[in-house]
């Protein structure tokens, strides 16, 4: 949160910050070791639920450069839980988190779901070379963050529909909710 306040107070974008780092330290004298990118779905009817992502993972109906997945569920209220799905190891070059941001905000700020509204978050965590490469691309194309983020997601993670007649999972069709989500980028 502090970084947003600092940038806003100076009327800087992240692209400005990256360019300033490059000018100050030289192109090869600084390195981004971690970069988190969040995509928020605040549609009343979200593109997908965390439960849908969980089921796709349980059935191994996804293709990813990141290995493994796990789930976390915590009590939200007397009737519901907040869910998180992790794909990939946290220390790997690229990992993903899908979670109920609406329930997190409700718990943190003592608000109701009606006040907050539907809010599902997709996060990509990039480390080391992947983080630095993305930051440098973003520096050169700061107005295209949505396109860059969705492109990274589309090229590295895909939820699929099983096909009994095809043993090669890479030939399976992309599931509808994922196609719709990836097509939702605001340019």
Positions of PLM-derived features:
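Structured, helix-rich domain cores that form ligand/interaction pockets
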Residues: 1-186
């Amino acid at each position: 949160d502090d970084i947003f306040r600092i940038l806003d107070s100076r009327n800087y974008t992240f692209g400005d910050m990256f360019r300033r780092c490059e000018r100050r330290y030289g192109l090869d004298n600084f390195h981004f070791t971690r970069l988190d990118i969040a995509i928020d779905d605040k549609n009343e009817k979200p593109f997908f639920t965390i439960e849908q992502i969980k089921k796709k993972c349980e059935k191994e109906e996804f293709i990813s450069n990141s290995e493994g997945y796990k789930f976390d569920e915590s009590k939200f209220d007397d009737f519901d839980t907040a869910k998180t799905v992790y794909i990939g190891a946290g220390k790997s070059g690229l990992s993903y988190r899908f979670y109920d941001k609406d329930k997190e905000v409700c718990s943190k700020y003592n608000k109701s779901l009606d006040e907050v509204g539907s809010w599902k978050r997709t996060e990509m965590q990039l480390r080391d070379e992947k983080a630095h490469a993305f930051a440098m691309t973003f520096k050169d194309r700061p107005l295209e963050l949505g396109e860059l983020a969705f492109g990274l997601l589309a090229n590295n993670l895909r939820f699929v529909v099983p096909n009994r007649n095809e043993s090669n999972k890479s030939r399976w069709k992309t599931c509808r909710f994922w196609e719709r989500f990836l097509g939702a980028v605001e340019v």
